[in-house]
Structure formats: structure tokens, C-alpha cells
Amino acid sequence: MASQLDLIGGDYIAGISINPPTNSRVTSVYSEVQASRIDHTLPLPSVFKTPFKIIDGPPSSSAGHPEEIEKLFPNLFGQPSALLVPNQSNEVSSDQKLKIGVVLSGGQAPGGHNVICGIFDYLQEYARGSSLFGFRGGPAGIMKGKYIELTSEFVYPYRNQGGFDMICSGRDKIETPEQFKQAEETVTKMDLDGLVVIGGDDSNTNACLLAEHFRAKNMKTLVIGCPKTIDGDLKSKEVPTSFGFDTACKIYSEMIGNVMIDARSTGKYYHFVRLMGRAASHITLECALQTHPNITIIGEEVFEKKLTLKNVTDNIVDVIYKRAENGYNYGVILVPEGLIDFIPEVQQLISELNEVLAEGNVDEEGQWKKNLKKETLEIFEFLPQTIQEQLMLERDPHGNVQVAKIETEKMLIQMVETELEKKKTEGTYEREFMGKSHFFGYEGRCGLPTNFDATYCYALGYGAGSLLQSGKTGLISSVGNLAAPVEEWTVGGTALTSLMDVERRHGKFKPVIKKAMVELEGAPFKKFASQREEWALKNRYISPGPIQFKGPGSDARNHTLMLELGAQA
């Protein structure tokens, strides 16, 4: 057992603990649903019900530029993925006592606690006497040596619960030589056999860099990743989905369904709902499939069709006009958080504004506008006044326009209002237009995980534990065959380098795990596209209601996953 000094990772004065670890969750105040979830027994893939062994697949490559990835990961590139299969006897010794660290990295996603519980329970079952340590506050906890030993009593209140508050997360990256040295010193001092990094694409890229660094130094610490992000953009053939996506989409869809019924009840509002997903539009697409809104904007389609901001606005106005002819003066419109990043003309505007702002020649009379290209100025003038002001005033520490702070849904409402007013003046539109804006984001990150996410995460944790015990490093825990019953799920590990490509930054190649964007030829988008015209003019609203843990719908997987796996028409 680690000493109190070890448990707090060095926060002490003269041997006296400043902040001894306490369990911040008090189960006595849990709701009935929370309490019932703690003791909910999770099924496991059948491979964990018998002795198993791990078999290697063929050598792997990368998602792009294999020659550059090989240079960046000389010790890991080409290593095979791994698969757990039943065996006559376990090939790993249950007498092996391991010291494993786990870290949560990046934004929250429902199910993270169950990954940790899965690792913990795996060690209890297959490597008795092992220790699991949680690094506090994300990767910074590794660099600063802040950790706590996780015990059965400590993890118990977090089983099947939302949030990341068991050990908390952070957005720090281990990327400079000094930071790698700090991580090296921490895992060496703790004598860790393995480290599990639970995170998204950036975090798992970092996990692979750590694995390469430790291997190059002949250190015994192995590194395994786990796929986390509600955005759903960390996936591949071997990693079918990232955890948290299922829960977040169902939380958002419940709220969208409620808004739809409100729209129909009042008969006078258009609800513009912005949804999380700064890069890919997976959440927006999935919520559309679950609820059938009147209009859904998919960023990848906007980019593919080279639509302008005016095109997007005109499309919305056209649907509103046609619905008014049918007697409907209300509706629901879904907008992805990252829409602006998909419109090249807006990116050009932001680029030129950054140059103007950097020169500091912004005068109240507007003479600075002469520095913009003609077509860029037209875009700027097309924007509502409030958005123009936001672009000029909201800057990050580097002086650049803060695109993420632009409330796209409010911008679209104002632009639609302007266009409809023009139609009124022309005498072609008579109805009143009232837009209501919503942003559904943080509400979806820490909800109680669905049965699917809870079970999937638990299996990911078991998978990570088995990979570490078998001596694997530089893999991401992978659970497949997800359309089948849980007992038939497959468990293994996918080479992180196989998911990677490179980007040129500051004259050097940097490894990145490629984000999985919405594929316009993929089954989820095709199903949506085949039905959206009907949804636009008729009310085919679905109100999914709250997430269910028992009874009808409780074990349903999301449409995106089932369509991509070919398990849904």
C-alpha cells in the first residue's frame, strides 16, 4: 500500500498532508436512479468468461504518409493489432502484481468512470494484489506527480455514474522535452508497469508519443489508449465508436424532442438549435436521425457543395416560406457547432480580419474596410451588425478573432430575419417570423451513461487491462461487433500508429490521429438525405424522451453506429 505522501503525489510540507484524498461523492444524497445504477451488474464479452490468449494480426501501416509516421515512431510503427481469443488456459500469470496508472484527458464524456472501473475490476480478477493509481487533473497530474491510489471503496460511488470527477481531467499536453522528462520521472518513481490514457484524438496521439518515448528509453512502462469523445470523430474500422457519443446524442435528442413539441404547441416559433461538434457534424446528424427536425445543416455537406453563408441562409428561408404556405409558422433547425469552419469564404474573411487587427488600423469611420478584398467585404457587410461587432471585438490572447465564440444559431436567426423582411417589403411573404436560439452542449457531457456506453466503457477498461498484462504498448483498446449481444463483442487493441497521419506545423511534420468526419457516401448520411425533404415540409417529429435504463429502448444503440455496421436499414 502506498504511503499518504505517495497518495497525494507530493503535496506536503514537512511530511504533513495539505490535501489528503477524500471521496467527494456522497451516495446518501444520490437520487433513486443514481443509487440503482451503482449496483447495476454489467455484462462482459464472453472472452472474459473463459481463459484467453492474445493473438497478433498482420503488420500495420498508417492512415497516411507511412514513411513519415515510421520516422516519428521507429519503435512502434508497423506493429500488429491484437485480439483476445478463448484458450485452454490463460497465458498471463495471475500471480503477476502490476502497478498501473490511469489518466483522463480532455473534455468529459459519459462513461469515463466505467473505463476506470473496468481496469480496476480486471486487475482484481486477473492480477490480484495489483495497484491502480489515478492521476489527478489530467496529463498535468502525470507531469507534477499528483495521483491517488484507487481502492474498491473509492471507486464504488462512481460505478455507472456520469462525470470525470473521480480523478478529474485536464487539457494539458505532454509535448516538450522537459514535459516528457517529467512524465518519465513520475512513472519511474512510481515503478509503473503501465499507463492508460483515456481521451480523444489529441490525447491518444499523445499516448502514442509517450509509448514511443518509453520504448526508446527501454523503460518498462507500457501505454494503452481508450477512445473518448462525445463528438464521435475518433473511430475507424477497428474502433467502431468513441464512448460518450451514444449518451450525449440521446440527451440532446430528448431536449430537441421537447422543443419540437413546444414548437408545435405554440405554433409560432422557429427553434435554432446549435449542437456540440466543432470539427465533425456527427452529433447533429445522429440527433436528426433520432428526432426528424425540419432542417439539419451538415458541415461536411456545406463544404463539399461549396455553399456560401448566403446559400445556407437562402435554403432556410426557402423552407420557412414553403412551410408557411402549408400553414406551418414554426419549426426546428439543427446547426453544428463547427459550421463556420466549413464555409471557405468565412475562413477567408477571418484570415483577412486577423491581418487588419494585427496592424491595429481599425478606425471608427470604417476606412479599414478598404483593406479587405471586394468579395470579402461583401461577406462582412452581409453579416448582422452584432456579429460584425463580435468579430472585431472578441479576440484571443494572440489577437485573433475567436471563431468558437460566434453564436452561429443567433447569427442565422438574424440573417433569416433580414431576408424575410426583404420578402415582406416585396409583398411575397406575410407571416411573422420569431426565432428562438438554443445551444445544447455541456448538458450532454456528464449525464448518467446509457446501458450501451456503461457496458462499452467497462469492456474497454477490461481490454486495456488485458493488453497491459500481456505486455502490449502503443495500442488503443478496441471493442468490436457492437451490433451483436454484449457476449459476442470482440476485444483487442488497435495500433495507434495505424490511425495516424501527419500535418505540417512550423516547418515540421507532426503526427495526428485523423478525425473521422461525416461521410456523405456513408449509410447514416444517406438515410438522412433520403428523408429530409419530407421532414422539411411535414411534421414528422419524434420525441425520444429521457434515457431509459430498463424496459423498451433501454439497450438500443444509436442510429449512426447501427447504420455504419450494416445492422439497420
From Swiss-Prot:
Explain what switches its activity on or off, per the activity regulation comment. Allosterically activated by fructose 2,6-bisphosphate.
Catalysed reactions, as listed in the record: beta-D-fructose 6-phosphate + diphosphate = beta-D-fructose 1,6-bisphosphate + phosphate + H(+)
Q: Which cofactor does it need?
A: Mg(2+)
Keyword vocabulary terms for this entry = Allosteric enzyme, Cytoplasm, Glycolysis, Kinase, Magnesium, Metal-binding, Transferase
Q: Which InterPro entries match?
A: ATP_PFK, PfpB_PPi_PFK, Phosphofructokinase_dom, PKF_sf
User: Which residue positions are annotated as catalytic?
Assistant: D231
Q: For binding Mg(2+), which residues are annotated in this chain's numbering?
A: D201
Q: Which residues bind diphosphate?
A: G107
The record's subcellular locations are:
Cytoplasm
- Matching Pfam families, A to Z? PFK
Q: What is its EC number?
A: 2.7.1.90
Q: Name one GO cellular component term.
A: cytoplasm
Give an example GO molecular function.
ATP binding
- Which protein family is named in the record? Belongs to the phosphofructokinase type A (PFKA) family. PPi-dependent PFK group II subfamily. Clade 'Long' sub-subfamily.
- Complexes and interactors: Tetramer of two alpha (regulatory) and two beta (catalytic) chains.
Q: What does this protein do?
A: Catalytic subunit of pyrophosphate--fructose 6-phosphate 1-phosphotransferase. Catalyzes the phosphorylation of D-fructose 6-phosphate, the first committing step of glycolysis. Uses inorganic phosphate (PPi) as phosphoryl donor instead of ATP like common ATP-dependent phosphofructokinases (ATP-PFKs), which renders the reaction reversible, and can thus function both in glycolysis and gluconeogenesis.
Q: What is this protein called?
A: Pyrophosphate--fructose 6-phosphate 1-phosphotransferase subunit beta 2
Q: What is the lineage of its organism?
A: Eukaryota, Viridiplantae, Streptophyta, Embryophyta, Tracheophyta
